[in-house]
Amino acid sequence: MSDDPEDRMLGWDESVFRDEHVFEIDWLPETFKHRDTQMETLKYALRPAVRGSRPLNVIARGPPGTGKTTAVQILFDELTAQTDVKTVRVNCQMDSTRYAVFSRLFAEIFDYEPPSSGISFKKLFSQITDKLVEEDEVLVVALDDVNYLFYESEASDTLYSLLRAHEAHSGAKIGVICVSSDLELDTIDALDTRVQSVFRPEEVYFNPYGQAEIADILGERADRGFNEGVVGPTVLDRVAELTEEQGGDLRVGIDLLRRAGMNAEMRASRSVETEDVEAAYDKSKYVHLSRRLRELSDSETALVEVIAAHDGQQAGDIYDAFSEQTDLGYTRYSEIINKLDQLDIIDADYTNVEGRGRSRELTLNYDADAVLERL
């Protein structure tokens, strides 16, 4: 290669990326590293379904970005390809009510959406179970981000309907995998006793990845996604270090690699340097926040904006400002506060206020400008 700097620069029609899709969150790796124990437990729980029986129920818990959803997707792909077991993954951030969950199940089972109105839950439920019995299929449902059902007080009713399906319709066989990233949520204790008695799940914990594991996993992505020689070991180690600082959330590291590659291209460079990683980090470290903010309703987003403008004030004072923008009552306002607190977007700690007793003080857990930029 020529020593001329111009020859080492990217041309307009060139890229550092070999396959940029590798850096999408939904890309499934060919090898799922450092999760053998978790995968074996999941396979153990689902094995009865392959024999035509109801599988064991499962709770998969762990911090964000530790492979829970990937594990479910890989197992579901294997079951679908090799067996007659029906699998459905429900994103509970999007489908956060019992009716929405069963509408998703209906759509996946029948390959078309249920009527948008005029169909009761009872009829929706019976059509799903009728189909399962008619086809003699076992259904495994993954409630991904199940914590969102708890935030909306829908978890117990949803799980009760799924777990008692065989009583409502003889022959219906349904197993449930609950996937939760909220480590402060005790899933079992938060359920009604009527659900606790029938749930009895296997528990699988996805621990945070260590720095060496992060480097190993991201190294595979880098090899697949970048052209040869674009990312060196020093850069990869720095990405792994920054990812571990964010709790080992692989989504941070994956996004960081992609943005660092884009920064290298902006410099017309054929290689990613540490400076590209550092410049990308300010955005990549908020990937988890961005994901949570995208799923908020209009009223929830409006409250986040108000809290950003009145950060650290009392809940009553913030409600006065919030009520000027919406017609929601204080009860719904309190419910939204609880949800934002559970999502770790805000802290809502009780404090003693002179002359007013105990009141909640609402503070953002992130820089206000960073939050507002992502709304």
Curated annotation (Swiss-Prot):
SUPFAM superfamilies: P-loop containing nucleoside triphosphate hydrolases (SSF52540), Winged helix' DNA-binding domain (SSF46785). InterPro entries: AAA+_ATPase (IPR003593), AAA_22 (IPR049945), Cdc6_C (IPR015163), Cdc6_lid (IPR055237), ORC1/CDC6 (IPR050311), Orc1/Cdc6_arc (IPR014277), P-loop_NTPase (IPR027417), WH-like_DNA-bd_sf (IPR036388). Pfam families: AAA_22, Cdc6_lid. One of its GO terms (molecular function) is ATP hydrolysis activity. GO terms for biological process: DNA replication. NCBIfam families: orc1/cdc6 family replication initiation protein, PRK00411.1-2, PRK00411.1-5. Involved in regulation of DNA replication. This is ORC1-type DNA replication protein 3. It comes from Haloarcula marismortui (strain ATCC 43049 / DSM 3752 / JCM 8966 / VKM B-1809).
